[in-house]
From Swiss-Prot:
It is an enzyme of class 1 (oxidoreductase). It comes from Streptococcus mutans serotype c (strain ATCC 700610 / UA159). The gene is asd. GO terms for molecular function: aspartate-semialdehyde dehydrogenase activity; NAD binding; NADP binding; protein dimerization activity. This is Aspartate-semialdehyde dehydrogenase. NADP(+) binds at residues 11-14, 39-40, 158-159, 325. It comes from the Bacteria.
Length: 358
């Protein structure tokens, strides 16, 4: 007997990939319900070659649903996820809304699937840039410990949604085909739809993802810091991030510097990463082999390379980490959580509702 699975935000960049990942999943599924806003309700999508009409998301959409995958923005999750839990579903939320809620486990299945065991009806999927870094760092943390993490990201525009993809393609065409000066291209979305100014991304790099906080870091950077500490259950671990948007469509890349508690031999570090589930070692500088964003598109794995000792700090290590931000960074991690819920016997209704109905 299979599950009824709902996908909220089914027509978006992540939602469409959730459908694809669910089609390829080992999760036993009897029925899929596709939900969206009024703008997309009525569209017809396919699941395993069957037409499925997209329905409007309402408070009553979750009757009979076992698992609900949310990727329609934090406000949608805040409004509807508690109703899904009340109806008996387990929610896997791909937005930031519940990530720091102490009643909600924040899960990368390869790293901390056990955190789901006492769930209260909602499991949060971490930020895309956090997820791939966790896959790369966990095998090192397990063997040698971590005393510091510093990361600089090179993030694809798809992390800002389909509208950002469309804007980037338009801008590049205007520069290449029409000869428009890159500085003169009109922008409406990036670096953050919620901020006062917008800048072109074509032939540019924007050192801002999301809006700035009071401490001069962006919310994206603080997500990486706070989520890393929560997932690793190390609240005192020093973590800092600089997040940059670059003009590629898919796959995030990260330059990660860590300091380990115990000195870690580089060849042993490479072996630990190569053996870790979900990680692929691509590190052969003699043959110029290292992770590339273009090569990661469409893959579920996280690719790690350029692993090398710091020149001055004995326990310092640098690496390059790449993954498809819409798959492992979002859709696949969400479906993978659903698979883990099934495997661990955790697809169950929650007796006590701990989330506010709005």
């Amino acid at each position: 007997m299979g599950y009824t699975v709902a996908i909220v935000g089914a027509t978006g960049a992540v939602g469409t990939r959730m459908i694809q990942q669910l089609e390829q999943s080992t999760l036993p599924v009897d029925k899929v319900r596709l939900l969206s806003s009024s703008r997309s309700a009525g569209k017809v999508l396919q699941y395993k070659d069957q037409d499925v009409t997209v329905e409007l998301t309402t408070k009553d959409s979750f009757e009979g649903v076992d698992i609900a995958l949310f990727s329609a923005g934090g406000s949608v999750s805040a409004k509807f996820a508690p109703y899904a839990v009340k109806a008996g579903a387990v929610v896997v939320d791909n937005t930031s809304h519940f990530r720091q809620n102490p009643d909600v486990p924040l899960v990368v299945p390869e790293v901390n699937a056990y955190a789901m065991d006492a769930h209260n009806g909602i499991i949060a999927c971490p930020n895309c840039s956090t997820i791939q870094m966790m896959v790369a760092l966990e095998p090192i943390r397990q063997k040698w410990g971590l005393s510091r993490v510093i990361v600089s990201t090179y993030q694809a525009v798809s992390g800002a949604g389909q509208s950002a993809i469309n804007e980037t393609v338009r801008e590049i065409k205007e520069v290449v085909n029409d000869g428009v000066d890159p500085k003169a291209v009109h922008a409406d979305i990036l670096p953050s739809g919620g901020d006062k100014k917008h800048y072109p991304i074509a032939f540019n790099a924007l050192a801002q993802i999301d809006v700035f906080t009071d401490n001069d870091y962006t919310y994206e950077e603080m997500k990486m810091t706070n989520e890393t500490k929560k997932i690793m259950e190390e609240p005192e671990l020093p973590v800092s991030a600089t997040c940059v948007r670059v003009p590629i469509l898919f796959s995030h890349s990260e330059a990660v510097y860590i300091e380990t508690k115990d000195v870690a031999p580089i060849e042993e570090v490479k072996a630990a990463i190569a053996a870790f589930p979900g990680a692929v070692l691509e590190d052969d500088i003699k043959h110029q082999i290292y992770p590339q964003a273009a090569n990661a598109v469409g893959s579920r794995e996280t690719f790690v390379g350029r692993i090398r000792k710091d020149l001055d700090i004995e326990n310092g290590i640098h690496m390059w980490v790449v993954s498809d931000n819409l798959l492992k960074g979002a859709a696949w991690n969400s479906v993978q959580i659903a698979e883990s819920l099934h495997e661990r016997g955790l697809v169950r209704s929650t007796s006590e509702l701990k989330f506010e109905l709005k």
